[in-house]
């Protein structure tokens, strides 16, 4: 994955992008209580931009900064201040810029059970990521593609899916019922994520083949010196390659899998026309066109599962569903209606 060159942005562009995040996607209205969670590694420029956007929306915003967590999800519970739990349940909208993140933790679950909070799992996107994901993409067009691909995957439940890459990935699975959907706007309580990615949920026991990842979020976001190879036959049976990061990957897999390597929980497909491989943001990397963030470990519907799994990352994937190619080397090529929508995606130049 080569390092990309990025255009600079000015304060006006950042302000516009933060407004899109806050008022367009997260549906923040005057009088709403909005919480930003950040950690000691979060980009402060991005945090301030989002806070200012909340103020411009006429809402009441605040920032709760914690030390960077060692793990995400329920594994973060011992490290999360109780006072933060009191704040999230009183929030109409919660924008989480921590990484590792709070989704799947006890306070996150309590907030969603309360039926009030709209939660954005924004992770580590920073100011530059906010500009690219929210300011340099037409969200209506992006969600048109995302929703069409999601609908295709819903209809394909029970069909065989095959995914390959030039680096050697060749894996098949049976598609399962989607675990969740990603609506255009956060106008109801629940979990939301930045635009530009669809999720493919396999029947976990059906996944078979070889997965070659170039990067991962295990305990942190790491680019591998050498590709890491996962051999899968129902469960993940073997991990090889990966250079010095392999030990961290194996440790994270066993932690999330209850001592075993666990399963492949999900595949994804990135489609955001302005997302870039910065090597500083895992979340933005998952939105790059053709990238696939592969969830590994134990799914949330099994004991001990949840948002505590590591993710592998691979690029330029090709995807077949029921023998029909829908993605070629990262580009959506079918069916014709979906391919036409995808071909219209271009960055917004300001």
Identify the function of each model-found stretch:
Residues 38, 213-215, 232, 240-243, ...:
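Active-site proximal loops enriched in glycine and acidic residues that flank catalytic Cys/His/Asp
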Residues 1, 21, 26, 74, ...:
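Detector for methionine-enriched segments
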């Amino acid at each position: 994955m080569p390092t990309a060159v990025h255009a600079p942005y000015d304060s006006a562009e950042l302000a516009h992008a933060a407004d899109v995040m806050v008022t367009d996607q997260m549906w923040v209205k005057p009088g709403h209580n909005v919480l930003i969670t950040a950690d000691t590694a979060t980009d402060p420029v991005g945090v301030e931009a989002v806070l200012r956007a909340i103020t411009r929306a006429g809402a009441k915003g605040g920032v709760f900064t914690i030390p960077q967590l060692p793990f995400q999800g329920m594994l973060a519970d011992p490290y999360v201040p109780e006072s933060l739990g009191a704040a999230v349940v009183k929030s109409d909208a919660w924008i989480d810029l921590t990484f590792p993140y709070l989704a799947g933790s006890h306070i996150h679950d309590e907030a969603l059970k309360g039926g009030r909070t709209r939660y954005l799992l924004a992770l580590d996107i920073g100011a530059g990521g906010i500009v690219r994901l929210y300011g340099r993409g037409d969200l209506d067009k992006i969600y048109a593609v995302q929703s069409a691909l999601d609908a295709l995957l819903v209809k394909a439940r029970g069909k065989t899916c095959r995914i390959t890459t030039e680096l050697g990935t060749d894996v098949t699975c049976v598609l399962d019922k989607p675990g969740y959907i990603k609506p255009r706007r956060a106008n109801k309580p629940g979990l939301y994520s930045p635009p530009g990615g669809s999720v493919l949920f396999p029947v976990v026991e059906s996944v078979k083949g070889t997965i070659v990842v170039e990067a991962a979020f295990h305990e942190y976001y790491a680019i591998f010196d050498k590709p890491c190879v996962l051999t899968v036959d129902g469960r993940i049976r073997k991990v090889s390659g990966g250079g010095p990061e392999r030990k961290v990957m194996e440790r994270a897999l066993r932690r999330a899998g209850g001592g075993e390597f666990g399963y492949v929980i999900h595949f994804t497909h990135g489609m955001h026309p302005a997302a870039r491989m910065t090597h500083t943001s895992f979340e933005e990397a998952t939105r790059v066109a053709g990238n696939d963030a592969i969830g590994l470990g134990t799914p949330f519907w099994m004991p001990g599962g949840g948002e505590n799994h590591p993710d592998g990352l691979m690029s330029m994937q090709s995807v077949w569903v029921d023998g029909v190619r829908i993605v070629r080397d990262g580009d959506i090529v079918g069916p014709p209606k979906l391919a036409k929508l995808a071909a219209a995606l271009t960055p917004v130049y300001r």
